[in-house]
Regions:
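Amphipathic alpha-helical regulatory segments at dimerization interfaces
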Residues: 9, 20, 61-72, 158, ...
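Short amphipathic alpha-helical signal-transduction/dimerization elements
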Residues: 121, 125, 210-217, 221
Length: 228
């Protein structure tokens, strides 16, 4: 995001935003993006967020489960949470095999376009869903919101997401919710790629993913780790 865009969204002058960015960059919280004209958050800033005790507890508990999942499936996996109108990846485990596709920690994507976004949305209360829709309407066109809602209906029937990636050919997004009592607090996702020869079929990978997500969910619901 460029300085002028940030200034416009925050209702501040370019000079004010420039000074803020200068300080944040000097302290290592943001850096210039290599892919777009603007800035992105660094691991240091993300670390501050994940050091919040409940999140830290969940990630520490989830890490060995995610490692086991990656070893069994030979696929990378990641955990994502809601961040305003976006999802953000807060933890990732790579497969021990030589070939993999993974999503970096700190990766952000609009909820309306993300696999994790659909899973998070369908597993919320009616009140929370309404709040999320109102937020999405501020950032997306009416057609984009309608498409998101249509996609969510399909996901709600399945209870999980299995869909071709909207961003990378040959990748199938597999995602299950991490549930706290009756709503999703995060998602556990595998970007599935078919290898030659096939190590584990997609349906078997889904079963392993479901088991891992349920194990983490039980820890949150039953207080084994502190709640978000």
């Amino acid at each position: 995001m460029s300085t002028s865009t940030i200034a416009e969204k925050l209702g501040r002058s370019n000079a004010e935003i420039y000074r803020m960015i200068l300080v944040l960059e000097q302290r290592g919280y943001i850096e210039k993006s290599e892919d777009i004209d603007g800035y992105q958050v660094t691991r240091r800033l993300l670390q501050l967020g994940t050091e919040h005790e409940p999140i830290k507890d969940i990630l520490e508990y989830a890490q060995p489960i995610m490692r086991s999942l990656a070893e069994k499936t030979s696929m990378s996996c990641h955990i994502a949470v809601e961040s305003q109108e976006q999802i953000v990846v807060i933890s990732r485990v790579e497969t021990p095999s030589n070939l993999s596709y993974s999503v970096r920690v700190g990766y952000r994507r609009p909820i309306a376009f993300a696999a994790s976004g659909r899973i998070l949305f369908v597993n919320q209360s009616a009140e929370k869903k309404e709040s999320m829709i109102n937020l999405l309407k501020k950032h997306h066109s009416e057609e984009e919101v309608k498409q998101f809602m249509a996609d969510c209906k399909k996901v709600a029937k399945q209870g999980y997401l299995k869909a071709p990636s909207a961003f990378v050919h040959g990748v199938t997004d597999l995602s299950y919710p991490i549930i706290d009592s009756d709503h999703a607090v995060a998602t556990l996702t595998i970007p599935y790629i078919m290898r030659i020869p096939e190590i584990m079929g997609i349906d078997d990978v889904l079963k392993e993913l479901k088991g891992a997500a349920e194990e983490i969910s039980k820890a949150v619901t039953y207080g084994i780790v502190r709640k978000l």
